Structures are given as structure tokens and as C-alpha cells.
């Protein structure tokens, strides 16, 4: 069926024992480079966190992808977002972001600096979805022991973040999202 004929919905998983968890993790692992992936123990630990949403994106009965985000009182931070490769280019990603925006809070995500064709295209995709790049120098903390943090561009919708909003996001990223990401 074509995208748009059915209602898009997010179905939340709260445990690694969910029957679709392994298929979801296979998509997750194949969609991001190692340095942008959580370690499995870390991923399993956060599944039940009240702010964390490990959501499967569905269009009717079609499982289109994953949107993994943190929701606070004042913003939503999309940590990971991916669509199954065979379904890319069919507006699932755009419609999933539109659905997230319906919550009426600023939506924040990070992208690689636009230096090659893929990263330039990705930035263009988010801009077409209403996101704007922010001017803040931003380093995402490392997901793995022995790795450096990585420089990323912070994008937000519906508008740029104020310094205060960026500060609140950066603090939440350090103290909640990235807390205990690898075992000491």
C-alpha cells in the first residue's frame, strides 16, 4: 500500500523481551555507525525509563521503522531515527516527524556536519521537514569506553533553540540520556 492511505502510529516497546525487539535492534545496528550506537546492555537498561520511547513507526499494519526519543516537559530529543531501507523515499520519515511535532513541543535532533553527499542530503531532508540548524558548538558524549565524543549539528523544529533551551538540552543529554552508557 502507498504511504498516506493509513494512519501513522508509534508503538512503544518498554522491554528487550518484546517479540520484535531483535528485529528492531537489527535495523538499529545496520542504520548507524558503531560510534553512534548504544551498547546492548545500555540499550536494555533504558527501555523502561519513563522519558524514553523506543517506538516502532507503523503505517497501518506496515512496520516502517524506529523513532527512539526522550520526552521531557519542555522538549523532545530524537536520539535515533531510522526507516527500513526498502521503505525509504516514501515519506514515512517525514510523516513520522510530523506526528512527533503534533505533541506541540520543540523537537531536537543531531546530525553529522554536512561535509559529504549523504550528510548534505540528510540535512536537506530535515530542513524540508521544518528543522533548522542551530549555531551552538555541540559535542555528543561517547557511547563507548575509549572513544571521543563526536561533533554534531543540533537541529530543532519549529525554530532555533534559545541559549537557555540549548543549555537545558545539553545538560539533559549529559546527565540523563548519556548517564551510565558504558559500564565503568
Can you name each region flagged by the protein language model?
Residues 4-41, 152, 164-184:
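Short amphipathic alpha-helix that is part of the acyltransferase structural core
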Residues 30-60:
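Active-site rim helix/loop that mediates acceptor-substrate recognition in acyltransferases
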Residues 34, 110, 123, 127-147:
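Conserved catalytic-core motifs of GNAT/GCN5-like acyltransferases
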Residues 52, 149-154:
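Short hydrophobic/aromatic beta-strand or adjacent loop that forms the aromatic wall/cage
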Residues 56, 61-70, 74-82:
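Conserved beta-strand in the GNAT
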Residues 83, 89-102:
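Conserved acetyl-CoA-binding loop-helix of GNAT-fold acetyltransferases
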Residues 103-118:
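Conserved GNAT acetyl-CoA-binding A-motif
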